[in-house]
UniProtKB/Swiss-Prot annotation:
Homodimer. ATP binds at residues 9-11, 17-18, 145-147, 184, 193-197. L-tryptophan binds at residue 133. One of its GO terms (biological process) is tryptophanyl-tRNA aminoacylation. InterPro entries: aa-tRNA-synth_I_CS, aa-tRNA-synth_Ic, Rossmann-like_a/b/a_fold, Trp-tRNA-ligase, Trp-tRNA-ligase_bac-type, Trp-tRNA_synthetase. It is an enzyme of class 6 (ligase). This is Tryptophan--tRNA ligase. The gene is trpS. Gene3D superfamilies: HUPs, Tyrosyl-Transfer RNA Synthetase. Catalyzes the attachment of tryptophan to tRNA(Trp). Its EC number is 6.1.1.2. Belongs to the class-I aminoacyl-tRNA synthetase family. GO terms for molecular function: ATP binding; tryptophan-tRNA ligase activity.
């Protein structure tokens, strides 16, 4: 069975877009791959974080994974900082990366421009740590969006460099892009991806939004003026985005949605979608609360940590041996 790895930062509550584009798809593939789902809190601290808020959001994200349908008997859910091999392997890969290629990373450039008090070194060395996250588990498949594709390409380059310089120790991962329709956009500006860090709360629906508030956001979402329910990302981005949300939450094919609402106006469609979103959030949040406030969540994270540690320790030891680190025993 091939291995799939995915990491999400606990830097905010995931949106309904994160659910449709990632979490829901993870549930679908956990029967087909040996899945490792990592809460990458060490990546989060490359930017300033409040320690209490970070811990809370880490636990919230773990509960959200489980509420989404991740089965701890099929997949490994764990927290990055609880598995020491990540920073160990991250440092080893940092030593074979060049400053030039790290400075070319688009996310580094974007975040460095926003840095108020100097550029944290962790921003620059973020990609080798991300590469370590992936290679530690002999990962074959990494599901990512366009914004992370450049980092995975760098990971593949670092794997080639390590294997060429030392030994064929590391597995070279393949990129898997989200399926068509899996990308959910901003509700008020459907030319931009929906983001949990957006300053305008009307642009996104958090998985922990109050359901009635979320329904209002759907009803006030931007559309066009012709009133035709048709999937056309180039010419009708607003209604196309709402159709994507409808399809993502109901599993109804886009063509069937178009046929169902043929001759109907946007008011009817938005009203129905608002109720679908509301019902989804009510059920989702009930599951979330049952995990967040339970000892079972800690048991699952302990189990995931132990499995991840066992698997990653083997890879780190192979890397250390290949590089000549430590004593020969």
């Amino acid at each position: 069975m091939e291995t799939l790895f995915s990491g999400i930062q606990p830097s905010g509550i995931p949106t309904i877009g994160n659910y449709i584009g990632a979490l829901k798809q993870f549930v679908d593939v956990q029967n087909d791959y040996d899945c490792y789902f990592c809460i990458v809190d060490q990546h989060a601290i490359t930017m300033p974080q409040d320690r209490l808020k970070l811990r809370k959001q880490t636990r919230q994200l773990a509960a959200i994974y489980l509420a989404s349908g991740i089965d701890p008997d099929k997949a490994t859910l764990f927290i990055q900082s609880e598995v020491p091999a990540h920073v160990q392997a991250g440092w080893m890969l940092t030593t074979i990366a060049s400053v030039g290629e790290l400075e070319r990373m688009t996310q580094y450039k974007d975040k460095a421009q926003k840095a108020v008090e100097g550029i944290p070194a962790g921003l620059l060395t973020y990609p080798p740590l991300m590469a370590a996250d992936i290679v530690l588990y002999n990962t074959n498949i990494v599901p990512v969006g366009d914004d992370q594709k450049q980092h995975i390409e760098l990971t593949r380059n670092l794997v080639d460099r390590f294997n060429s310089r030392y030994n064929d120790v590391l597995v070279k991962p393949e990129i898997r892009m989200p399926k068509v329709g899996g990308r959910v956009m901003s509700l008020q500006d459907p030319t931009r991806k929906m983001s949990k860090s957006d300053d305008n709360a009307k642009n996104f629906i958090s998985l922990l939004d109050e359901p009635n508030v979320a329904a209002k956001k759907i009803k006030s979402a931007v559309t066009d003026s012709d009133g035709i329910i048709k999937f056309d990302r180039d010419n009708k981005p607003g209604i196309t985005n709402l159709i994507s949300i409808y399809a993502g939450l109901t599993d109804m094919p886009i063509k069937d949605i178009e046929a169902k609402y043929e001759g109907e106006g946007y008011g009817k469609f938005k009203g129905d979608l608002a109720e679908i979103v509301k019902a989804f959030l009510v059920e989702f949040q009930e599951k979330y609360e049952s995990f967040y406030n339970s000892d079972k969540l800690d048991d699952i994270l302990d189990q995931g940590r132990d499995k991840a540690h066992k698997a990653s320790f083997k890879t780190v030891k192979k890397m250390e041996k290949a590089m000549g680190l430590g004593r020969k025993r």
